[in-house]
């Protein structure tokens, strides 16, 4: 929100001095779809007489993210004199690595934790509960952080694959170190990170020919470094598991399925078991069409609510697709899907060289919605700003 506020005067200056700014045809079309989602949300809460405006104001949220992305990319361009997809990606990697390290510091050092908790309000009371006790950074916790870590893992997967065919292959080890750090600590923060990990490794296997047993020699350095860094990661994890206080608990949470497989001979994850019970479908045609007007915990927003609420979720479900349906029906769900699809499609059209990366990001978003309702529009928003910057550079060169 603060970044969006900073972006407003920058936007005003750009419009006044250069007659350029944030609004173009693509942003306008995105706004239309976000507006449709908001209108459907408004209709649902009005028809159902509920006070839950979670997605009735989605167009405002979309513009907040766009303005924040505009601010970030503008400052990057000011510092470096240019803005590119790979430059932005490197910044995103640095931010996520710092968040992971900060999460460990907050968990390990009470003084740091006290300072962060004093000045940053991000639901620490819930995160610090004995039965929750989750790692968190600054604005990075639970599935919101997990979905963004997952997005970054597939972006790293694409960039490393691209490096294998260029002189930049010397940076592969550095990117892989960041990859494993985010994969491990990210899973300690939120196991949604696993989605990105699986898609990233699957992408590497597909691109390098591992699945067909015909490995492309261009990718030999990738797999060589991958195995070495994986081995080092396992050694460090085992050491920390046995000798660093509280690490055992964090690792067992992050990779519960693997521990269950080794100790019990079966893959079992408690959150997956809970997730199965959350696949609850609407029982009336009205709910399928326009929803019931509840997205947030109804006990917290509606003093007159007498319906079904389990575990803090309306109808007891945290599944993204189902929460959208229960909130504003299939129409609202379709509008939300189109917002993300259009954002990804515009990125593909503008930055066609990175087509695979944006397809992976779309896949991350739509797979995450089978688990939670968090979206990664912010990620697409920043790359839309990259495309806009490149378009401005071309126009400037044409004038010259």
How would you describe each model-predicted region?
Residues 215-223, 229-233, 349-353, 383-400:
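A juxtamembrane structural motif centered on a specific transmembrane helix
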Residues 216-225, 237-276:
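Flexible juxtamembrane loops connecting transmembrane helices in multi-pass membrane enzymes
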Residues 154-158, 197-204, 357-400:
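Transmembrane alpha-helices of multi-pass inner-membrane enzymes
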Residues 136-141, 308-344:
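A conserved mid-to-late transmembrane alpha helix and its immediate loop/hinge
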Residues 168, 202, 206, 210, ...:
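Hydrophobic transmembrane alpha-helices and their immediate junctions
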Residues 116, 126, 258-328:
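Long extracytoplasmic/lumenal interhelical loops at the membrane interface
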